[in-house]
Amino acid sequence: MEWSDVFHEITTRHDFAAMHDFLEKEYTTEIVYPDRKNIYQAFDLTPFEQVKVVILGQDPYHGPNQAHGLAFSVQPDAKFPPSLRNMYKELQDDVGCIRKSPHLQDWAREGVLLLNTVLTVRQGEAHSHKNIGWETFTDEVIQAVSEHLTHVVFILWGKPAQQKIKLIDTSKHHIIQSPHPSPLSAYRGFFGSKPYSQANTYLQANGKQPVNWCESEV
């Protein structure tokens, strides 16, 4: 099964014409992130059958030279966002590796689906594309992963992500949840939660290759 099959299933159940029209207008009249060509980059870099881990974000970063279609990741020459800095701090404490690039393309190629629940945003306006249809689309994506694959690790940071548990068959997948890595909540239980080693322990116990969370050339 490929993402094209998943998208076909989704679009036969839902009409996204209104969202498509809205986005056409937004990209024509406003500055919107990510670039059009990168909206679906998470799916381009992580083939459906290779998904081992899903990390859920909310909407893309809304500053210049940041969002490129992968949740939590920014372009290589961008400044580190605070949440990503905290993710890397926990990564170092958990598995002992230091990442220097804020770009997570290598994770995506390792089978980590870095999925925002909303895939576009207007510059400088967080949540500006909330409730235009993306949530319906990405809920269906989560359900498709849950239905068609087995032994996937879902990493859910913060309450919005944890509300998606109802979409996941927990009898055949593994949920890792903790507070969000943002500075507002990282010290309330994100630090010390060891999500990276937990994910690999589960994957290996179920006959899958662990994720190389450390920096690698792509």
From Swiss-Prot:
**InterPro entries recorded:** UDG_fam1, Ura-DNA_Glyclase_AS, Uracil-DNA_glycosylase-like, Uracil-DNA_glycosylase-like_sf
**Can you say where in the cell this protein is located?**
Cytoplasm
| Keywords (A to Z) from UniProt | Cytoplasm, DNA damage, DNA repair, Hydrolase
Question: What positions constitute the catalytic site?
Answer: D59
Keyword check for Secreted, yes or no.
no
GO terms for molecular function, please?
uracil DNA N-glycosylase activity
Q: Which Gene3D superfamilies match?
A: Uracil-DNA glycosylase-like domain
Annotated family: Belongs to the uracil-DNA glycosylase (UDG) superfamily. UNG family.
Q: What is this protein called?
A: Uracil-DNA glycosylase
Species for this entry: Staphylococcus saprophyticus subsp. saprophyticus (strain ATCC 15305 / DSM 20229 / NCIMB 8711 / NCTC 7292 / S-41)
